[in-house]
A protein has these predicted regions:
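C-terminal capping/lid region of NAD(P)-dependent oxidoreductase domains
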Residues: 2-4, 221, 296-300, 311-330
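Glycine-rich beta-strand-centered segment in the early N-terminal region that forms part
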Residues: 18-34, 47-90, 106-109, 126-128
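Short, well-ordered loop/turn sites that connect or cap secondary structure elements
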Residues: 75-76, 154, 243
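Residue-level marker of beta-strand positions
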Residues: 79-80, 114, 159, 179, ...
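NAD(P)H dinucleotide-binding glycine-rich loop of Rossmann-like/cofactor-binding domains
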Residues: 85-164
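Glycine-rich phosphate-binding loop and adjacent beta-alpha segment
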Residues: 99, 180, 188, 231-300, ...
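Hydrophobic/small residue at the entry helix of a nucleotide-binding pocket
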Residues: 143, 168-169, 234
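Adenosine-nucleotide cofactor-binding segment
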Residues: 162-165, 178-235
């Protein structure tokens, strides 16, 4: 089969590799579509823990079950499925196990024509989604659903701020918030992305590159009951100032690194909660799929590339030009 293969840091090729085989408890899925995440770019750039080359990246995928291994229900054969990229979560809902990993490293990922995965990580493809939309759903849907519902305990009367709108998780979080009946606001350095977020249901937004943006946003729309952030860095104290007393800040990344200082007194005096969130459990995945099907939500797909042009898909994500998920089709 053909697959995207990272032979070393910044060495991406389309390679011919052996077809995967389903061992006991596994299935082989012929992929109809896959999608990129920032994680794939960080692996390509050598900026991810536990690097192993060569590897096939990709955490998101949807396709048709082609074969099953020993012990797997044969009724999976021929079924349209999406893949839960959260592997070996473990028995606790509160946090993942030590054996937890994400599909696409160290296990071979979805940027290929076929993939072998545990049967326990399959779910029926939501019937209202096209293949490209279904492939765009797993990681962003799982991550955003857990951080909003399991961690932040989102309520319909909440006012929520999402920082850095445009990526898959942030955009799907916006869709979940709007569907739940809560009020969403966004930040971006792009007026176009803010405008497109408003078209999806956001109540407003702010350009975080503008001087005093946090003060202006607070006066116009704040404070916020929930703030969703994946950046961290030196602007983190602005988020503390924007949070309502008793509010929750949920972090699912730290792309700008650690802040040099944190306003701890404001956190304890105003009864704020700082919450971390990573991926999600099988229960979170099932809950996300139920919510998506009930509200007929569709992930935003920014652009679709054939597998042969995967390098262009990676380049688009590296420069941050996407609004929504970047999809690759074999």
């Amino acid at each position: 089969m053909h697959a995207v293969q990272l032979a070393a840091v910044n060495e991406l090729t389309i390679a011919s590799v052996p077809d995967p085989q389903a061992v006991s408890g596994e299935v082989v899925v012929r992929l109809r579509a896959a999608a990129l995440n920032h994680r794939d770019v960080w692996i390509k750039l050598g900026q991810y823990a536990g690097l192993k080359f060569p590897c096939i990246p990709g955490s998101d995928g949807a396709g048709i079950v082609e074969s099953v291994g020993a012990g797997v229900d044969s009724t999976w054969l021929g079924r349209e499925v999406i893949i839960n990229p959260s592997l070996d979560w473990g028995g606790r809902e509160s946090a993942q196990s030590e054996g937890f990993s994400i599909l696409g490293l160290p296990r071979e990922g979805t940027l290929a024509e076929k993939i072998a995965v545990p049967a326990a990580n399959l779910a029926p493809k939501p019937a209202h989604l096209a293949w490209e939309e279904a492939a765009a759903l797993p990681l962003a849907g799982l991550t955003s659903h857990r951080l909003l519902f399991a961690r932040a305990r989102l309520r319909p009367d909440d006012r929520v701020l999402i920082t850095g709108i445009g990526g898959g998780v942030a955009l799907f979080a916006l869709q979940l918030i709007v569907a739940q009946g809560a009020e969403a606001f966004v930040t971006s350095s792009s007026a176009e992305k803010i405008s497109r977020a408003v078209a999806l249901g956001a109540a407003g937004g702010a350009d975080y590159k503008e001087a005093g943006w946090a003060t202006t946003l607070a006066k116009a729309h704040g404070p916020f009951d929930v703030i969703v952030d994946s950046a961290g860095g030196e602007g983190f104290n602005d988020l503390i100032d924007l949070t309502a007393p008793g509010g929750r800040i949920v972090l699912f990344g730290a792309t700008r690194g650690n802040p040099s200082s944190v306003a701890l007194r404001k956190i304890f005096w105003r009864q704020l909660s700082l919450l971390g969130s990573t991926m999600g459990s099988p229960c979170d995945f099932a809950g996300m799929l139920e919510f998506v099907s009930r509200h007929r939500l569709k992930p935003v797909v920014s652009e679709v590339f054939p597998l042969a042009r995967a390098a262009e898909a990676f380049a688009l994500m590296e420069r941050g030009g996407q609004f929504g998920k970047i999809v690759v089709t074999p």
